[in-house]
Amino acid sequence: MELTRKTESLLRSLRTRHGRRKSGCCLCEGVRATGELFLRRPELVRFTVATERGAAAMGNIPGELCIVTEEKFAEFSATVNSQGVLAVASVPPEPGYDQPPRDPFLLALDRLGDPGNFGTICRTLRSTGLTELWYTRGSVDPYGDKAVRSALGAQFALSLRSFENLETLRQQAARFGYPTVYLTDPHTGEDCFRCSGLFDRSVVVIGAEADGVSALDGAARVTIPMPGNYESLNAAQAATVFLFEYVRRITAPAPGGILS
């Protein structure tokens, strides 16, 4: 495949949210991130741009491949020390309303604007075996280059669903059979390690570090106990605590149920 002026224009446009929306594509850069994409969703790959070094590191690359010099690759790379490989992929479509989630509970992100946190949460969620991640408007683009790099491409193995706000998210969750919403709070709420129904057909909402979770009438509040009396954890840290508390419960269940 040859690198044309049109292809170069597309590569540059995908650094912006507008460009991704207009084209329906995104960038996936780095050996591990593109490797996850190639393994999980090879049908999404439109083409790959790589240096000789990057192509050798990847081995088998699906679809069309364009080999470029290190200097030319640097024009498209968003990293200082690139690994010499990036793929252009179609943004996966969101699951339809006729495709209900299969997870025992749902993790939702409310107005989470930091791509590093968003990507880390995708990666952590993927490690637990869960498949759904919901988020509200005001959150970062899950397919921005920073979010994809932070996640190492994990979002391509997940079902991501976006909503206008928490209320519309709650309504759809209830239709799917997840009636209870837990809002995470750094200061008040039930202890997450003692909340027996926390992962029982529920929605656990993580908010932005600066603003927290939006208000939602009728939702329960749950907190991570912090004996050190620190202000708060960042969103990715908090999500990790909740996700691996879920893992702890399913791997060492109590005789009477999920809570041990």
Which residues does each predicted region cover?
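Boundary-proximal intrinsically disordered activation/regulatory segments immediately upstream
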Residues: M1-A55, S139-D141
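Short pre-catalytic strand/loop immediately N-terminal to key active-site residues, enriched for Gly-Thr
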Residues: G24, L109-G113, T223-E231
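Amphipathic alpha-helical repeat scaffolds
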Residues: G30, G113-T120, L233-A238
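Active-site regions of enzymes building and remodeling cell-envelope glycoconjugates
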Residues: N60-E71, P104, L198-S202, G218-I224
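Glycine/small-residue-rich loop that forms an oxyanion/phosphate-binding "nest" at active or ligand-binding sites
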Residues: P62-S90
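Structured adenosyl-cofactor binding patch, chiefly the S-adenosyl-L-methionine
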Residues: A87, R126-T128, P142-Q155, A215-S260
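RNA substrate-binding interface of SAM-dependent RNA methyltransferases
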Residues: P93, Y97-H187
